[in-house]
């Protein structure tokens, strides 16, 4: 994930294409509503449409958000239905069963694949051109399901993947060294879940490996402390859910960061989930650094991993593939 990349900017100048930017959010739960709020504050979209089976809740969210618009950006937010997917720049899918304390993301699969089939059936009635951005867990499996069930081009079906894990990882390493997290380049790849892995071999600060940075800055290189950063990253969602019941702020910021890269045609490298293959395992969706622009997500680099990282990525991809096969979508 590129260091120094931000969703928000003080630059209030908008392109002439701003009025055509419509983002549809399916799901008015914690993640969906927080994504709508974050998107409103970003000023990226002229229209934000909220769709939910609970229309009263979705309408209430839209009303509340519209009251924030005069204090932020000129954006129209409204309760919509699937017809509003027509001419949408992107459809963000956050709807689904939430992860409860003690549950893994994979535990949600059976319930959420059923929900997704209904949602995608409706979405594809009204758009064949939007970018589909999946946030519902297990996100890698549901990104693959979205691709298969819609027949959309692979570059236009994107999962939020490990963008939030990468952000968490950078935050924790930055905290360890007393640095702005955006000064840290360190990626989490593979599954957004228990088998994800840290790419230690390419982690860097100011162009230096972590070990070299510590030597140059006369800071102790503590491998155990760094491993704790990864452990905390991997367990972050469980820890937050145990305390407050759900995660939403970081995920929403990640989704809007992805949308920003698409809307601004940035060609930004972000760790998101997309169709890929690895080590002859076959087609599967998992996170790697991908280039994001107005056309979607594109894999432009091959990972040069250490032997240990390669083995871990193989196992991570296999675990996603197994889950895909369990719902008959291979």
Curated annotation (Swiss-Prot):
Record-linked PROSITE patterns: L_LDH
EC number(s) reported in the record: 1.1.1.27
CDD domains assigned to the protein according to its UniProt record, in alphabetical order: LDH_2
Repeat recorded as keyword: no
Protein keywords: Cytoplasm, NAD, Oxidoreductase
Any one of the GO BP annotations: cellular detoxification
Binding site for substrate: 105, 137, 168
Locations listed in the record: Cytoplasm
Pathway of action: Fermentation; pyruvate fermentation to lactate; (S)-lactate from pyruvate: step 1/1
Reaction catalysis annotation: (S)-lactate + NAD(+) = pyruvate + NADH + H(+)
Domain of life: Eukaryota
Binding residue positions for NAD(+): 137
Active site per database record: 192 (proton acceptor)
Name of the top EC class for this enzyme: oxidoreductase
Gene3D superfamilies in alphabetical order: Lactate dehydrogenase/glycoside hydrolase, family 4, C-terminal (3.90.110.10), NAD(P)-binding Rossmann-like Domain (3.40.50.720)
Family according to the record: Belongs to the LDH/MDH superfamily. LDH family.
Descriptive protein name: Probable L-lactate dehydrogenase
Organism whose genome encodes this protein: Schizosaccharomyces pombe (strain 972 / ATCC 24843)
Taxonomic path: Eukaryota, Fungi, Dikarya, Ascomycota, Taphrinomycotina
